[in-house]
């Protein structure tokens, strides 16, 4: 940690920091240097205060458990706001806040918020350093937990201080009282209220996406506004490298709403028969991809430097690479813990003995979950066993295919290909997830999550669709767009497709389609595979027919639902409405 006067930050940053210090009445200020010594010092302070528990050093070296407040366990969409002079700029899917309301929150909750506390200044960069993607930010916080998470998920500290530009994204976070009714996560991408010199404000929360301002707040909500203005894309997408047996490498991005298989696909290993044939996969990003144009193509990078991922359900069968990643140098949030100091969550081998649940209660693993369903692990990208050697490429990697996917029990085939770019945008704009349990609301109820950006687009979603259409016009070599659905079920409720590493069989067909015009059947909704490799899978002819069955009656109902959804959003781009009308005609 550095004293403010020895940090070598530029004068613009120093002036801003001094202003925040004065307003929040911080007792002292330190600039985070990002060193292992700093991490050790802060983690020891958290252990001493009881906020961190040191985990079993033999099984999980340099790893810790953090338990959040019981009311502060997930991103809070209903408490997340876009501040704009006019509500239409935020759009119907965002919560709008007036500039006057921002001023009120700033003065009520941030004035004196650090009284008696240390103010931590975290200089960070998103994207590979010294690249055309690099974007800088500073998060100011009173939370040591936030500091240590940013150690892992960003490039931060000394390595970015010297290159911090005069203009950077300014984020201010205050833990506050954790009062859920006064929790605010505010984004100010356009005009600022007088006296509020910040792009992001977060208060009365200390959880993940609400408090780690580099992540969803900067890398998606603020970045998406800038991307539209500057002509690029900031997307809630994985980024995967696939190498075929001939050594050819192809790069794929994919947008999936929560619980739709994004992390597992990002971390996929080819099944045994493919690996033996020479296929390889390598990760670039599990969560966010920034894409910029070059030579008529999209080139992508991961703006982040680590993982902050959901952990329940993860085991050596479902995601071996995640298990390797979280086995060291990891912060666990809201998992359970065994008496021997090992983290535990649902999906690991069942235990009969008592263990500590996510609230710290020692009990048998029956009844309520031991780990919170949204419990997380934070690990550096360098922990991952199969990282692409182009993860730091200053130019990014060329994107050949874009995947959209949702969780649908019926109707949507295992995979289908868009007829063209605009049709692909229509597919992404209308993707959705079915509720799968009574506790989540009505079973089968559909939540539309366009491009998986519903909670993360920093501006009006109809303008976002328009931006995608315009990007397609500018590209001479557009990625092909596909839709995947791993979750189609049989009549008895069981999943038809085995999923997990077997999803690679779908990737194989997608890669084939990038260079070939055959092995596809035209349907009213897009191209489906004529043949897909199912050798070794326990799938019947009836299963395969059901995986790709086009239910015209069901699709007519889907079109009605999409019409209602478009009416709710309003101002849908003409090109998208044309695709909608063409789809309806093909289905009728």
UniProtKB/Swiss-Prot annotation:
Localisation per UniProt entry: Cytoplasm
Coiled coil spans: none
Cofactor note: Binds 1 Mn(2+) ion per subunit.
InterPro entries: PEP_carboxykinase_C, PEP_carboxykinase_GTP, PEP_carboxykinase_GTP_C, PEP_carboxykinase_GTP_N, PEP_carboxykinase_N
A single Gene Ontology CC term: cytosol
Major localisation: cytoplasm
Metal-binding listed as a keyword: yes
Domain of life: Archaea
Assigned EC number: 4.1.1.32
Class of the enzyme per the UniProt entry, highest EC level: lyase
Residues that hold Mn(2+) according to the record: 216, 236, 287
Keyword set, alphabetical order: Cytoplasm, Decarboxylase, Gluconeogenesis, GTP-binding, Lyase, Manganese, Metal-binding, Nucleotide-binding
Catalytic residues (positions): 260
Catalysed reaction, written as an equation: oxaloacetate + GTP = phosphoenolpyruvate + GDP + CO2
Positions of GTP binding: 259-264, 376, 407, 500-503
Pfam families: PEPCK_GTP, PEPCK_N
GO MF term set: GTP binding; manganese ion binding; phosphoenolpyruvate carboxykinase (GTP) activity
Annotated GO biological process: cellular response to glucose stimulus; gluconeogenesis; glycerol biosynthetic process from pyruvate; oxaloacetate metabolic process; propionate catabolic process; response to lipid; response to starvation
Function in brief: Catalyzes the conversion of oxaloacetate (OAA) to phosphoenolpyruvate (PEP), the rate-limiting step in the metabolic pathway that produces glucose from lactate and other precursors derived from the citric acid cycle.
Family per similarity comment: Belongs to the phosphoenolpyruvate carboxykinase [GTP] family.
NCBIfam families cross-referenced by the UniProt entry: PRK04210.1 (NF003253)
Protein's recorded name: Phosphoenolpyruvate carboxykinase [GTP]
Species this chain originates from: Thermoplasma acidophilum (strain ATCC 25905 / DSM 1728 / JCM 9062 / NBRC 15155 / AMRC-C165)
